[in-house]
Design a protein with these regions (language model features):
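A glycine-rich helix N-cap at a beta->alpha junction
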Residues: 3-16, 35-38
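TRNA-recognition modules of translation machinery and tRNA-sensing kinases, especially anticodon-binding
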Residues: 48
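Two-metal-ion acidic nuclease core segments, chiefly of the RNase H-like superfamily
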Residues: 34-35, 160
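Alpha-helix boundary recognition
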Residues: 3, 37, 61, 153-154
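Catalytic alpha/beta active-site cores
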Residues: 1-5, 28-30
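Thiamine diphosphate
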Residues: 9-13, 19-29, 53, 62-172
Length: 172
């Protein structure tokens, strides 16, 4: 109803991940993230660390005519970047540029960004250049200029997504 009424409501959801499984399969919401993204006039944020969480909270407060959802994990996650420019405002950004010629781009959201960073490190140790893109908000990323989106996700590079959920939607 808050989406239909264009209300500024901020929903804070926790336990967003299968990373902590001791609560059992009823607490592993693998389909929920994509389902929430599909609701019209709702912005879903899935931050990867405390910096992104603070940025996404600020963006949610600024959403005057629609509800926002912050999907947070219960896992202890590392801080992946320091402050500075509010990178989450673009929906996605290059968290880690390739150290060698870029061969792969890993796009990840939320707690899986840490997995992407660890994977990139392993691949780069084998000589493969890997960018890591953190995407806290799909909807914001899709509103960016074509040039920005093409710079982050060029056509001529292998792209891999990591999100603990359904693969629906990632094909785009």
């Amino acid at each position: 109803l808050s989406a239909l009424q264009k209300q500024r409501v901020i929903y804070v959801l926790t336990h967003d991940s299968i990373g902590l499984g001791e609560d059992g399969p009823t607490h592993q919401p693998i389909e929920h993230v994509m389902t929430l993204r599909m609701i019209p006039n709702v912005e879903l944020f899935r931050p990867c660390d405390i910096i992104e969480t603070a940025e996404c909270w600020t963006l949610a407060v600024e959403n005057a005519d629609k509800p926002s959802i912050l999907a947070l994990t219960r896992q202890n996650l590392p801080q992946l970047r320091t402050g500075g420019e509010m990178l989450s405002a673009k929906g996605a950004y290059r968290l880690k540029p390739a150290d060698a010629e870029r061969k792969v781009i890993i796009v990840a959201t939320g707690s899986e960004v840490e997995i992407a960073m660890n994977t990139a490190k392993m691949l780069e140790e084998k000589g493969m250049g890997v960018d890591v893109i953190s995407m806290p908000s799909w909807s914001r990323f899709l509103t960016q200029a074509d040039e920005y989106r093409a710079d982050l996700l060029p056509q001529d590079v292998l792209k891999v997504s990591i999100e603990a959920g359904t693969t629906f939607g990632w094909e785009s």
